[in-house]
Regions:
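PP2C/PPM-type serine/threonine phosphatase catalytic core
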Residues: 67-69, 103-227, 233-611
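N-terminal mitochondrial targeting presequence
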Residues: 1-146, 155, 610-611
Length: 611
């Protein structure tokens, strides 16, 4: 019998805290709130009015930090916003109407360099850049003085937050980065990952694991089942945390049974079915088995614990690589995305999507739902399920899956929410994934990018692959510092080119429901390759930096300075994993088979004294 023994790489969950929320037009769950668009522009001769000059002699009022309970709302996927700047500004807005997205640039003067030093060489009082956050505006200005200014408010109630410097921005970007060197000689040589919160706490999560398949006989070599997954939560973090804990285990168990039943050579259809069963069985436990346990216990505390993953929701993107066959399977539930990068004969990289964004705006998904629910004209409305939920496939989201009887019983006995009056024949949302299969070519240096949808709102598939390719060129041209660096150069080569080394594909329009870089239009910035930069050792961090502005350090700093949940109007939670395939050598010692790449991993937090 061929049995699979699991070995965990690393899993991670991080929490951050932030500030008070503003109103948005629509959140992911679909409740609409009208938001006015600030269309006034400050004339050039009045821009000085947005310069806040507080000297060290002037009294400064400090607001006390307020700790909030866990936020549960996943805010605007499509929002009407305005980004207004007085001294230095950027912005654009786009409005959402029905299934179309209209974009118009406004206030596009662009970021310029701002002062963070004394106004005159002889001055002892520093001038610092600040963000001014109002109810309907965001502006930048300067603050003169030496005292702390975070959480300070002016006479009009606007919060004034000191802008992060370039170094502080890099520290924030790299705070949650991790990198691992894989020296198992089985097709994978390295993987990098990073997270950047926007919600408070972050609603994304991720998981990684090796399932080691032992040898059957002396003449056979073992193989690895390698898993990487990103989970994009909405309406809270509890569902994505549940997936981090259990999804790989459920899928590996189904795969193990399938391989045993198929004599270690199951059909491709059987493997796909096993992955789908792992997904749907876990969702059944989250949505339905939890209800049975809650009704048996008749306890509010038990209900609060067990129903939390059912009431919130999460997309899931899971990759499964079999080192023996070099087959890579990607199972997608929701709108996270996987893209494969492969070097072509001319030295450039090609970008191949391995998943499709599953939303109400995807024509195939909309047609599937209309066939499953005939006669229900509002099953997909404005690109959303029943006019509310954007992903058409997701874990949790029980209000779209429970029967009316169950939902009403839970609402009366505990604290469940009321269902939509449009709900007639649930379930409307499924966790069953779409599975794709690709033959990986480690000898060509293939790589895989997995990311939640926040990244794809800022970069195209080709830009992501080209950015990884550009980063690889920089790494390969550096002097080797170890045996791994020599192997790296052998696999990925070394070259120097201008622009991104990627084959350009057909420009995406969004008509097929696939996410396009709407944030670039929202921010009103150029979409040419000159905006990109290479300055990070972790390639996942490198992708996020360039998604936020790249060379434009002031834009990067502004987007990173924005406190949660206000930041959600301009960027989503971000989780990115990049896996590099290659025929590296196997380490002699088992303890060296998977090691932390310290050059691309955030240092551990120092231990604090208890006394």
């Amino acid at each position: 019998m061929r049995r699979a023994a699991t070995r965990a790489f690393r899993t991670c969950q991080c929490t951050v805290r932030g500030h008070r929320s503003l109103s948005y037009r629509a959140n992911r769950r679909g409740s609409y709130v009208h938001s006015s668009l600030l269309q006034s522009q400050i004339p050039a001769h009045n821009q000085q009015s947005l310069r806040f000059s507080f000297t060290s002699r002037a009294p400064i009022k400090h607001a006390h930090p307020v700790r909030e309970p866990l936020q549960s709302s996943m805010n605007a996927r499509r929002a009407t916003v305005a980004l207004l700047s007085g001294i230095v500004g950027y912005g654009a807005y786009y409005s959402y109407n029905g299934n179309s997205t209209d974009t118009a640039a406004a206030l596009t003067r662009g970021f310029s360099s701002s002062s963070s030093s004394p106004t005159n060489p002889g001055d002892a009082i520093p001038t610092r850049s600040v963000l001014v956050i109002g109810a309907e505006e965001l502006s930048t200005g300067t603050f003169v003085g030496e005292g702390p200014i975070s959480k300070t408010t002016d006479d009009e109630g606007r919060a004034i937050v000191e802008m992060l410097t370039a170094d502080q921005s890099s520290q924030k970007l790299r705070k949650m980065e991790e990198s691992f060197l894989v020296n198992r000689g089985r097709g994978v040589v390295r993987y990098d990952q990073v997270q950047l919160p926007s919600n408070n706490p972050i609603e994304d999560d991720h998981a990684e694991k090796i399932v080691e398949v032992p040898v059957r006989g002396a003449s056979e070599s073992g193989s690895d089942w390698m898993f990487w997954g990103v989970f994009d939560g909405h309406s809270g973090w509890t569902t994505s945390a549940k997936l981090r804990q259990d999804l790989i285990r459920y899928v590996a168990r189904e795969l193990n049974e399938t391989y045993k039943a198929g004599g270690n050579s199951p059909t491709s259809e059987a493997v796909d079915t096993a992955m789908k069963k792992g997904f749907t069985r876990l969702d059944d436990e989250i949505v339905h088995h939890s209800v049975q346990e809650v009704l048996k216990s008749n306890s509010r505390s038990v209900a609060a614990e067990l129903l939390a993953p059912a009431l919130s929701g999460s997309c899931a993107l899971l990759s499964f690589y079999d080192s023996q066959s070099n087959l890579l399977r990607v199972a997608c539930t929701g709108d996270s995305r996987a893209v494969l990068g492969r070097r072509s004969e001319n030295g450039k990289w090609t970008a191949t999507p391995l998943s499709v964004d599953q939303t109400g705006g995807n024509p195939d998904e909309a047609n599937r739902l209309r066939k499953q629910h005939p006669g229900e004209e509002h099953v997909v409305r404005n690109g959303r399920i029943l006019g509310g939920l954007e992903p058409s496939r997701a874990f949790g989201d029980a209000s779209y899956k429970w029967s009316k009887d169950i939902a009403e019983k839970l609402r009366q006995s505990f604290f469940g929410r009321s269902q939509s009056p449009l709900l007639k024949t649930p379930p409307y949302v499924t966790a069953e994934p779409i599975v794709t299969t690709t033959k990986v070519q480690p000898e060509k240096g293939d790589f895989l990018v997995l990311a939640t949808d926040g990244l794809w709102e800022m970069l195209t598939n080709e830009e992501v692959v080209g950015l990884v390719g550009k980063w690889l060129e920089t790494q390969s041209n550096a002097a080797p510092k170890s045996q791994f660096d020599s192997v790296w150069t052998k696999i990925f080569g070394a070259s120097q080119k201008n622009g991104l080394p990627v084959e350009q594909g057909t420009a995406a329009t969004g008509g097929d429901g696939q996410k396009t870089p709407i944030r670039v239009r929202q921010w009103g910035i150029s979409n040419d390759d000159d905006r990109f930069v290479v300055k990070d050792s972790n390639v996942a961090t490198h992708l996020i930096r360039n998604a936020l502005g790249g060379k434009n350090e002031e834009m990067v700093s502004a987007l990173l300075t924005l406190p949660s949940p206000y930041s959600r109007r301009y960027r989503d939670d971000l989780t990115v994993q990049v896996i590099f395939f290659g025929n590296g050598e196997k380490a002699q010692n088992q303890s060296e088979e998977v090691v932390i790449n310290k050059d691309a991993t955030a240092p551990p937090k120092p231990l604090k004294a208890k006394l």
